[in-house]
Regions:
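Glycine-rich beta-strand-turn "strand-cap" elements at beta-sheet edges
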Residues: 2, 40-49, 76-107
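Short, well-ordered beta-strand segments in beta-rich or mixed alpha/beta enzyme
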Residues: 2-9, 38-67
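Generic alpha-helical hydrophobic packing signal
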Residues: 3-5, 15-17, 77
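Short intrinsically disordered coil segments
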Residues: 23, 71, 103-107
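Short, surface-exposed ligand-recognition loops at beta-strand->loop->(often short) alpha-helix junctions
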Residues: 9-22
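Intrinsically disordered, low-complexity acidic/polar segments
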Residues: 15-17, 50, 62-64, 97-100
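An amphipathic, aromatic/His-enriched active-site/gating alpha helix that lines ligand/cofactor pockets
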Residues: 24-25, 29-37, 56-90
Length: 107
């Protein structure tokens, strides 16, 4: 399993609007993507204009396809609500109780 994280800082007072946009526009797009598994959106309790979206993918290739084919349009959709460009990072999932993945142990 593979993840993409997208860290954002919204313009003042735009966090709720971004959350609504993600729920109404972004999630339906994600759900149609090959290999998409799940999306978790976190909002900072101390900095309410900061958020982190974590998407889970079956494979790195699925996430890369989404990044190339769909993410540019989504980035344009959310850009007016942001203070800065989103920061995208990718990770292999090592352990997850939700997705029933356990770290492999060396023999």
């Amino acid at each position: 399993m593979f993840t993409r994280t997208v860290e954002v800082t919204t313009k003042s007072g735009k966090a709720q609007e971004l959350t609504t946009l993600i729920n109404d526009k972004v999630l339906p797009i994600l759900k149609k993507q090959t290999g998409f598994v799940d999306e978790t959106v976190l909002v900072s309790d101390t900095e309410p204009n900061r958020g982190l979206a974590i998407s889970f993918w079956n494979t790195k290739q699925d996430a890369e396809r989404y990044q190339k084919e769909q993410y540019p349009a989504i980035q344009e959709m959310i850009r007016p609500l942001l203070d800065a460009e989103p920061v995208v990072r990718t990770f292999n999932v090592d352990t997850s109780t939700t997705h029933k993945i356990a770290a492999t142990k060396a023999a």
